[in-house]
């Protein structure tokens, strides 16, 4: 996986290089694009997306060019890349690096154009049984979570650190909310959890067994299709510039940001 992460980093450099040089080539005329479909990812809750939704930054900036921005709500990384491949999505605003790697290895033409965040502490393995004190105690247990994601990668890394293999647990592929529900009902022994569902699980009596710190870097990326990058590079550049506006708001408008954080149960975001 480390080699794949290096490849992911190289793909970012490659995509940014393509963007920086997009103005110098003569290309065949491409019809103007008057819409932009950007995922709004709620789980885990991430501050730049919340800031953008509150301030309507993308809508206002692209509106100046008469471009309509819509925000399909897709939390699953796999479903984001599926939508990208089908052409029903233009920008994966917050895509797990693991999901990007798996999609690319399966032939999806996804291009990483930026790093959204790195927040390993936001991704957790949670349990309810007090007898489970470490990853080693997961041997033979049933664990649920979204397959092929950063959370899944953390599970594999935690097991490896405990000298266990992925096959030493009974893994069930479920979404995060369903995994928490299964943990609370006793159907499984451990759940892979992120976002506001961590707080929900804790309120119901679950505890964090471990998080991604020291196991993975938990890179969340911004992805577009190769076609989008090739045909509409200026839109991609503008998207990244507007995203930076949201980051600048986070850094400068501390009081307003805290007010937004109080409205939603947001986990810390490390850039």
Named regions from a protein language model:
Residues 29-33, 127-142, 228-237:
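Flexible hinge/capping segments at coil-to-helix
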Residues 85-95, 108-110, 141-142, 184-193, ...:
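Alpha-to-beta junction loops
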């Amino acid at each position: 996986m480390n080699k794949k992460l290096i490849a992911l980093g190289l793909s970012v450099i490659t995509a940014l290089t393509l963007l920086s040089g997009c103005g110098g080539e003569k290309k065949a005329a491409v019809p103007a694009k008057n819409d932009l479909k950007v995922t709004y990812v709620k789980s885990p809750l991430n501050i730049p997306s919340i800031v953008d939704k509150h301030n309507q930054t993308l809508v206002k900036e692209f509106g100046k060019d008469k471009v309509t921005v819509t925000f399909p709500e897709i939390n699953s990384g796999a479903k984001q890349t599926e939508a990208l491949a089908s052409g029903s999505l233009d920008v994966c605003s917050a895509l797990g690096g693991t999901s990007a790697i798996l999609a690319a290895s399966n032939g999806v033409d996804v291009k990483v154009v930026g790093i959204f965040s790195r927040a390993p502490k936001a991704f957790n393995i949670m349990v309810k049984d007090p007898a489970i004190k470490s990853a080693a105690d997961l041997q033979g247990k049933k664990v649920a979570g979204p397959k092929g994601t950063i959370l899944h990668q953390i599970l594999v890394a935690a097991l490896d650190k405990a000298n266990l293999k992925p096959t030493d647990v009974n893994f069930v592929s479920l979404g995060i909310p369903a995994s928490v529900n299964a943990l609370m009902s006793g159907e499984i022994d451990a759940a892979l959890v992120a976002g506001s569902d961590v707080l929900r699980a804790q309120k119901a009596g679950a505890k964090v067994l471990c998080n991604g710190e020291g196991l993975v870097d938990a890179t969340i990326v911004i992805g577009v299709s190769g076609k989008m990058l090739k045909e509409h590079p200026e839109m991609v550049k503008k998207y990244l510039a507007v995203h930076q506006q949201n980051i600048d708001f986070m850094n400068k408008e501390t009081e307003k940001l805290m007010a937004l954080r109080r409205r939603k149960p947001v986990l810390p975001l490390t850039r």
